[in-house]
């Protein structure tokens, strides 16, 4: 039923053709069940294990590697001679890499539990309904409830469907609907129509929503929506429709993969075509097909060389290390790629309650009457320090601490706060914090009593558990609470009837009242001044109300409560406590004692974090279900708005936002910094508009209602105290619910990206070198300098360790003084591309040169001519060009060993070059990153391992080197440092002075 909240009870019952006392007939139930289906959320069809595995192979680079492995396997199958076993090593290693990669990918996907499934935990198992087949209420499975059913709910129940209340069977009905609205204070419900068809869920006071909890009271209602038609069902549909965006890093790596695959394909084809003339060379036995296959193998080796196989593992390791560092700062990252996305966050949309504020109501101001003369009066105003539930704070008057027992009015005010109250403070030993037990508003009053200590109770030596309610206990020993007149909407107040624990002639029964100021003060005939009471005159009333209005609408927008007493109440037996309509009669002729103003105060550290965001070019937007006045006041206190800043077109309510045209809504999202009284759908819409401006949005949330927006935004941030649905829909969970933790995580994300750029460039320059090496050997007609199994070893192990260590580079000092980077900015641009191409060409040329040196110039080498080396495939005994040359020398492992050793050593030098993008090694020495030094030592040790420990040399087709050969390796390798230092010097001084580190 649409807009059931706007209809009267009779209209709703008439729509379903149902009687409140008897319920639906079985025939009606059957028809309605057929029409609307079961009252449950459909289960989400998850991906099968096979689908998840296949997904891991959709990446282009992975497919190229898979193809290379398959081709290598086929070629190895037909291999003859000694190389039969070693030929299988390459496809086996490639497949091993791909399998490991797929396992990690599948595990991560399985680990990200389905947020849609988590919604089901809010579905109650049973419900209580009235139906015509039974005279009394019956318990049935909640999934069998249909629209039109008459449902009974009571305290502790979970609401089984969306229900329009028809009658309330208790004084009040309080509902905790925080999972849907995000607001922690329970809501008082009624049965009157709410005429506004566009009312937000918070304002539909005559509706109960599926999955919410009854905090107090008992009521009956008619079901108006079930299953996916409920509010929680709409959230589920929105989540199903929300596609997960790929992170900027994933998009970059996808683009890089596509470009690389095109380059690889071109080079492979080019190498094959260049050598068509050699297909018939004698070494291939004159067989054109065998020659074609030989060069096809070289093309496959090229593909293996060009792909940085170690990159996925290094990126995963770097992100995992980043998540550990973030966890220490209370940011628990659930999705690894999002660590890097945090670095380019340009907008943070934050909840107010609990994130920007403490979510711990505290009284910060109060007043009592000082003097009254006719229509004029003066007040004693006090401020209270301390912004949490900890019973630690002072009462100040004119900025100086005061002793509360010196003021009779404060003693009485504390007595009302302690007795007209059902809450308590509770010390949580495990977490070492004070928590509320009961309503937030009442806990604030309990905490105030502890800070006031009106009877000067000795508090030293008490444990924290004893300290929690020490001062309240003293007051409760003096008077005993007999009964409570519950809060009701008509009088907007509640009261308690108390009798003295030690009766005497002077002490008598009293009623203590607290409630909304306008309601309570209208029923006050007198006013307390010190220990006397004087009549309340219109002038005094006006003065008191003007102060209360000022507190409620000023810079703090405090929530005010008036406190009063009834000095001569009726006796209990004279009251009718069954009918709450009579309560207002018993709460008249009151004496006004004072007023307290409370708020959910901003966290102390938030203002500095908001300032840091401004420096870093990040816009902070507050999004809250609270009213606009309170939201703007908090924004001013924490620096989102200036103290006197005009908030027109910068702060909107959900209603105001809906009334704008789509283009005006888009403009609003470009400038706004505060959205109040919003619904979940607004959050998703705001994220969409921000994304249309290419903003990278971090969105916080804790309720079920926030899940679609958390899923839609680039970075969904759930609260540690939030619902399971919010957590599973998010990329990150704040263990401490603190806004400042988000800012610390953004800083970490920026540092991680900078380090990632360094190691990605490092790995790519290595791959460029390998490609140049293989291309040169093929183009010059030299014997193979590097084979695929060696390239895999270098790409995975030797390069992988220093690349991982580059993830430990210290962050720049000015990292949060720069604007967010453009997510579309390429990983490697212009000058840097030239730099890494130049270095790569040197790496390739040096590797080929090292192999050629052994053939042409080495003392222990064959000393063949350049012509003989470049035409080695024509070598045979009857060829005069190769007279005196043993053709087997061209298959010696020495040139390969020289090439591999030069490649490894140059890469270690290159790792040192990557310590900083533009800073010289003289300014930033290697020991700035001790992990890098350690990883270089480990990589070289592993290289010695495969050189000198059997049977590894056989697998890698290499052989140990002597000292002369090692000295030549160093002579060829070390110039790469000088070369990069020169390029850095040019960059620093001529090309990119703005990037000076």
Curated annotation (Swiss-Prot):
Database matches in SUPFAM superfamilies: Calcium ATPase, transduction domain A, Calcium ATPase, transmembrane domain M, HAD-like, Metal cation-transporting ATPase, ATP-binding domain N
Binding sites annotated in the UniProt record for Mg(2+): 351, 353, 702
Keywords: ATP-binding, Calcium, Calcium transport, Disulfide bond, Endoplasmic reticulum, Ion transport, Magnesium, Membrane, Metal-binding, Nitration, Nucleotide-binding, Phosphoprotein, Sarcoplasmic reticulum, Translocase, Transmembrane, Transmembrane helix, Transport
EC nos: 7.2.2.10
Tissue expression per record: Isoform 1 is expressed in the heart.
Topological domain spans for side Cytoplasmic: 1-48, 111-253, 314-756, 808-827, 917-929, 985-997
Cofactor: Mg(2+)
Residues modified as 3'-nitrotyrosine: 294-295
Domain of life: Eukaryota
Region (Interaction with HAX1): 575-594
Quaternary assembly: Interacts with sarcolipin (SLN); the interaction inhibits ATP2A2 Ca(2+) affinity. Interacts with phospholamban (PLN); the interaction inhibits ATP2A2 Ca(2+) affinity. Interacts with myoregulin (MRLN). Interacts with ARLN and ERLN; the interactions inhibit ATP2A2 Ca(2+) affinity. Interacts with STRIT1/DWORF; the interaction results in activation of ATP2A2. Interacts with the monomeric forms of SLN, PLN, ARLN, ERLN and STRI1/DWORF. Interacts with HAX1. Interacts with S100A8 and S100A9. Interacts with SLC35G1 and STIM1. Interacts with TMEM203. Interacts with TMEM64 and PDIA3.
Similarity section: Belongs to the cation transport ATPase (P-type) (TC 3.A.3) family. Type IIA subfamily.
Protein function: This magnesium-dependent enzyme catalyzes the hydrolysis of ATP coupled with the translocation of calcium from the cytosol to the sarcoplasmic reticulum lumen. Involved in autophagy in response to starvation. Upon interaction with VMP1 and activation, controls ER-isolation membrane contacts for autophagosome formation. Also modulates ER contacts with lipid droplets, mitochondria and endosomes. In coordination with FLVCR2 mediates heme-stimulated switching from mitochondrial ATP synthesis to thermogenesis.
Protein's UniProt name: Sarcoplasmic/endoplasmic reticulum calcium ATPase 2
